[in-house]
A protein has these predicted regions:
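Conserved acetyl-CoA-binding loop-helix of GNAT-fold acetyltransferases
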Residues: 101, 107-120, 145-149
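Alpha-helical elements of Rossmann-like donor-binding domains used by nucleotide-donor carbohydrate transfer enzymes
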Residues: 38-42, 113, 117, 169
Length: 174
């Protein structure tokens, strides 16, 4: 797996009362890690439980190992904080998949870190457009709010997706 470190320094005030250094590491395609497997399995079970049959597009681990998909787990120190994947639909068009925040880190803006990381990686890979499919139910409202906060706009179904009352589709031009 490839490792990438991001560093961010936050200074409380101009007198330097204290300095907080946050180190987040990103590991690509580490499906052998038990913590990653546990998080993904929980993600699959939960999404399949809230989506009607035929409307769930969540990928299992073998699905995420497809050569068209790049998967990252994000860590702070030795704790898994979340994950996300990027699927190549066309040479300049990618789709976000399997975005998940570990339960312990919910409501701490980790979803924003994951989406930011995926957008940054998408730009590095030369994508010009990103898309995502998510659920239309109340359970998915936080995800929809997160994506629109990054400028994603509703769009028609893309790639293999079809109109579905249980799905919402979004895209972002980079």
């Amino acid at each position: 797996p490839r490792l990438r470190r991001q560093r961010q320094m936050c200074i409380r005030d101009r007198y330097l009362d204290y300095m907080f250094i946050e180190i987040m590491k990103s590991i690509e395609n580490n499906f052998d890690d038990p913590k990653v497997n546990e998080l993904l399995n929980k993600h699959f079970i939960e999404l399949r439980s809230v989506s009607p049959e035929g409307s769930s597009h969540v990928l299992d681990i073998p699905g995420l190992k497809d050569p068209s998909i790049r998967f990252w787990s994000l860590w702070e120190e030795e704790e898994l904080i979340g994950c996300g994947a990027l699927k190549t639909l066309e040479p300049n068009h990618g789709e976000f998949k399997s975005i998940r925040v570990a339960d312990k880190f919910r409501k701490q803006k980790i979803g924003q870190k994951i989406v930011s990381h995926l957008i940054d990686r998408s730009k590095q890979l030369g994508f010009k457009k990103l898309s995502i499919e998510t659920g239309s139910g109340e359970f998915f409202a936080p995800a929809r709010k997160l994506f629109t906060s990054f400028g994603f706009e509703t769009c028609r179904p893309f790639a293999h997706y079809k109109e579905d009352i249980n799905s919402c589709y979004y895209s972002l031009n980079l």
